[in-house]
Amino acid sequence: MTEQTKRTTIVLFSGDYDKAMAAYIIANGAAAYDHEVTIFHTFWGFNALRKEELIPVKKGFLEKMFGKMMPRGADKMGLSKMNFAGMGPKMIKNVMKKHNVLTLPQLIEMAQEQGVKLVACTMTMDLLGLQEKELLDDIDYAGVAAYLADAEEGSVNLFI
């Protein structure tokens, strides 16, 4: 009996720290169990892929506004519940540190080290005015058709 390749795909739509944490915890767990894993980042899920530093790029007015409204980098994302004007993320990160839980940036780095394929949705990049140099290095760029091709082969497909 031949062993079939196990595939996990995750659409990360949410821009919330806790939901992105869940996506990356699942991705790292699946990769540890020898799954081929793809995380397809779209809309607010792009917050996890943005570089923290300001990258000078030429943009129109609306694209500049999106850039200012979206958190720059995974560590700047808010919580889905109990954000408390930014105090919630500080509190949960403090609790995570006490319990030796990896931060979202560390989980992203671990995922890349394990070969998890991080994909940025090119249509969303166009809509939000994001450019490749504003995003993390070593990620892929593709449209929804590429995600669907991966998902069609997936044994686990999640939307977060």
Swiss-Prot record:
It comes from the Bacteria. Disulfide bonds: none annotated. PANTHER family: CONSERVED WITHIN P. AEROPHILUM, PEROXIREDOXIN FAMILY PROTEIN. This is Uncharacterized protein YrkE. It comes from Bacillus subtilis (strain 168).
